[in-house]
């Protein structure tokens, strides 16, 4: 039996309908501050919490419900005679329902406000009440999610009360919410990349149809705080995004944003299969397509400029899963939308280079992003690369960062003509990339050459310049082979393994 409900919410969505429903069922409503005023202004009879506690709100509203009368009314076990006798002697009435949503710390932590102002959005009274109610869920219904109001109304209307399973689920949602809420506050105050206890605060954005494969279930969660591209994008067209789509989008968007120049990238199975720069998007796309006309089929296209109609028409000639761009011309959008299943993604948020997390069985690995590229290039051969070759080398190394190790990228005219990766030795991806390219000017490697075989193979294909981190005990062998074949080579001192 629900006789008394305490309501204290920041988000007033759906509140009037719920409050009126409870009132019609004969439930006494107790409320605080802004919620009390809101209900009263909308002609819903409500008792202010200070009338129950005999204690006015103080400290600018910081202390409203932190009172034994409130928490005894919530925590008293109805089937415990001693509990009920105690609160009866103290003239404390049981509270049967707690409806609370918290100060929006998740949102405010990223606002352009002072540190002190952000601290004021750390809720204290709300979490205390809902944790108490959740602990005593058999006797007290606790509601923290506006999305549960309709289900709550339905249950009470049809059954006169809320069944155990739903009460338990609502209680579980409290601790689920508090885990994320406290985690966000902890991260805000600590400002540490590697704290003693790692709190990850994410909220479910969508249930996905399946995971990497149809027999795997999956969901998509986004960070509760901060702005990031794979959180703050807009889908303008097409089917629901899949697990694999989102992973591929992430890589594609990171690659294309490595470049200030006009760039296009094609991604397939979480690996770039074509990357190119151009004087305009049309040229960049055509060059990207020519990198690998076979693998681009069914892939993802990303560009770093507003997509124009000419490029959209060219993209529409083949089947791709997704097109992602910072914006779209109106005519370009019309062309792409003719394919009703094509997922069109608008994203204007740059990659964050945030901490990277990998799950292992029983733990997680955390590392900083691989955001270092070339600090000091050292020419180690007799021949020096030309300025054009240096720029192509840097282009190739930027692409290498996103290819699974061992990674080799062959470049000509700012076009990744050959991409080889994911092999357990370095010569196999070298042969694959050179064979794919047919001809190229420069070659980039994500790690050093353990032997001179990569240089020997590159020489057969007329490679003019090579970029690699260096650091092998046999660097001398590779340098000698370059000198023998008139190839210039530079060391960066920066490795880019990707597992």
Swiss-Prot record:
Coiled coil: none annotated. Residues 1-144 form the MGS-like domain. Pathway: Purine metabolism; IMP biosynthesis via de novo pathway; 5-formamido-1-(5-phospho-D-ribosyl)imidazole-4-carboxamide from 5-amino-1-(5-phospho-D-ribosyl)imidazole-4-carboxamide (10-formyl THF route): step 1/1; Purine metabolism; IMP biosynthesis via de novo pathway; IMP from 5-formamido-1-(5-phospho-D-ribosyl)imidazole-4-carboxamide: step 1/1. Its EC number is 2.1.2.3, 3.5.4.10. GO terms for molecular function: IMP cyclohydrolase activity; phosphoribosylaminoimidazolecarboxamide formyltransferase activity. GO terms for biological process: 'de novo' IMP biosynthetic process. The keyword Hydrolase applies. NCBIfam families: PRK00881.1, purH. Belongs to the PurH family. This is Bifunctional purine biosynthesis protein PurH. It comes from Clostridium kluyveri (strain ATCC 8527 / DSM 555 / NBRC 12016 / NCIMB 10680 / K1).
